[in-house]
């Protein structure tokens, strides 16, 4: 399929490059560094070769979210966004941008989002899970009350917010002791991000801000296939408190969330996701440079789904969600 839009596609700046070192074997690190720092060369050639018209670029993980010092987090977020704006300006026909945000400081994050959207032309934000602040030992999740004004501005700006994974903090990772292979994208990423998304749903956030659009990668971090059970078992809880939100989890999932195919290239999983959340809320992504563009594209181009759904997922859903036809 030609003309695809891909939207979980990462880059790095020198200050955040090392954050990605632990996710690949040592003998592959040199190649990954090249992939993360390159935008205009290898990346663009692969896009051309595999029918990707547009990439929406975002900073690698955890990057800004793992900088407990507020001032430093604000500085790195702003620098990353400025670098990305310059790169996108070189090829505005091929590259768009997600803002990195210093959510250690909700007011600063709000201001940076406003700057990126209004002044730099970014199409949304991608945030790498919870943020660390102060001593770095307490994760800040975005259902907390201090983030409500931030979410109000996201809704006002009418841009999507991509909740990208990161590993849990060491003190919250004891279940993985002795099993480090379960950390990262193998399992811990999905578990951490799914719980964060459920917290957002349960908090009442989407009752207060019903026009928010949240994106989850990796075919929804396992949530599409658990929504029925989550609501079914929660309904058995007869005694208050249950949760502050007014509706079922599945209602928020189906109305406020979108999912991407990033790093999850399995047809059975895609078909189940279509049955659960609908083809209108699924978007193509590759997860470059941690996955290969040819693998993602070859699978998607050949996967056994309706051609109308392929066009939606590969292109038109993203163009609608990010309002690309008016750019």
From Swiss-Prot:
One biological process term in Gene Ontology: secondary metabolic process
Pathway(s) per entry: Aromatic compound metabolism
InterPro entries documented for this protein: ACMSD, Amidohydro-rel, Metal_Hydrolase
Superkingdom: Bacteria
GO molecular function (one): metal ion binding
Family in the record: Belongs to the metallo-dependent hydrolases superfamily. ACMSD family.
Protein name: Gamma-resorcylate decarboxylase
Organism in which the protein naturally occurs: Rhizobium radiobacter (Agrobacterium tumefaciens)
